[in-house]
């Protein structure tokens, strides 16, 4: 792992400006998906560790939607974020020199994939996509990989049109993963999608992901919902660092994050949205397919 980590750091050094200025603060962007208070609480330990490691004030930013973090990274107002694969693709396609992927969250078996999970209320009688005919389907955010991009490709490929009124009565955005879960529970939509590693027990919300976080938080009792669809494996999104950061800052943050699980497993649990084996090196190459899918999706919508 140390050799791979060194290679990642060396690669990021090649794309960084030669004369980066010293930083006076460090800013970590948190993607939407759950309420801002819970996002801040889950990442406060990491913020404190970062502030100690860098010796400068460190702030967490909770954007209202995915695009807020995407634009913050592109515009240089954010220094670090854990992105979904589609959100990383959005950053890369707008400015390929803005950030570099350095690490990825791994599952307990060492893999770094997860799934888009379709679900409905257990008392709805819906047990599969077939049962969603003439029903309302909720999706989290147009920049979410599991909350929109992958379902947009895989659900039509399985024979179910995503055009509102053709199979589903309507296809709507809820604003985020947690919002989708709440919308299904409240009956605002008949079914929805969110993300999970797909490992472990359903009644726990799997081992990690939004179902696990929402179950831990008491937002959902997993006995009240059922799985109605599951995507093929999706590459877990990368932790990225802004390329314009000084090299010593990028090195410190990569090493801090890579060692977080060993140093403080409970903190890593909160940051990783559940059980994790830790954070391992990753490069841009892991996301080439997702970038191609996003380009194709944008071409179709234009």
Pin down the residues of each PLM region.
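Beta->alpha turn/N-cap motifs
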Residues: 32, 62-66, 77-95, 104-105, ...
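Pocket-lining segment of extracytoplasmic ligand-binding domains
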Residues: 138, 142-246
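A conserved helix-loop-strand patch within extracytoplasmic ligand-binding domains
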Residues: 104-160, 164
